[in-house]
Amino acid sequence: MTTIILYIHVLSLVYWLGGDLGTFLSSRYIVRDELGVEARKTAFSILQECDLGPKLAMPLTLGSGFHLTATYWPNLFVSFAIPMVWLVVLLWLSLVYFQHHSGGNPRIATADLWLRYGVLLLGSFFAFKAWQAGLANWVALKMAVFLSLVGLGIAVRYALKPFALAYVRMVTEGATAETNDAMRHHLAVCRRYVWVIWIGLFVNAALGLRLVNV
């Protein structure tokens, strides 16, 4: 069972990075002035499909990572901690799936956002408590990095709101210098967060492989 969970944990990293890269590259074509609106809409559709991978990978990383941690340090967690966390993961995955296939239902999006806040706050509390109780430094650091990535994901969501407004204006009214500049600017802000997310994933991979000792 542990091997399967580890396999899921590794695949989650692969899909997170791979999907993020596809999202990053396709976003470039949305802001290319020389492309027509239809071509840019196609690029946006590709972006949305690529982005599903990282959105699914984040909760799976949480579930598999916690499962492994609780398996190797069982004395630090209550007996029902693993199924409880997997229930949260299943809820999170459901919200991601239905949000993707509902065309961005605002209620589902809000529920997903609040769940992320809950993961960030409660995860930080329990990770700190586990570290105080004797959790290995490298695992505690991995948890801290992951929770930072959750926070950065929330920041990306807020940064994308003005981009989305400019994109809708482009689709409904046609491309203008104003909408092009707005999309380019807000997408550049999001990319800064994405770069930091990638660095965090590289750091966590190094910690997990024990390439870095802390």
In which residue ranges do the predicted regions lie?
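Polytopic transmembrane helical bundles with strong interfacial aromatic enrichment
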Residues: 1-214
